[in-house]
Amino acid sequence: MTILGSISQIGSMKMGGSKSSFNGSSCGAGFGSNSSSSIISFFNPLLPVVAFISGTVTSITGLVAGALTGTVDGLGKGANTGILLGYTPNI
């Protein structure tokens, strides 16, 4: 129980630290003029959503690419095995 409690505390501390530094960096980016800071403050709540969508797209792309690579690799190995099995009795 105490181990789980300390782990959750560490996790919440880490999340809080990254969140505050993230907000600080985004506010610092829009510090130059009022228009850019207002645009950034408007889009600031949307940043986690954008990050989630881009992460999801990246993971789906990786899954598709991995599946295609595995399929091509599997087809190549299957063809090689079939050729070997087909020619071995004739030799």
UniProtKB/Swiss-Prot annotation:
Major subcellular site: membrane
Annotated GO CC locations: membrane
Positions of glycan attachment: N23, N34
Record's protein name: Protein sigN139
Keyword check for 4Fe-4S: no
Subcellular localization(s) per the UniProt record: Membrane
Alphabetical UniProt keywords: Glycoprotein, Membrane, Transmembrane, Transmembrane helix
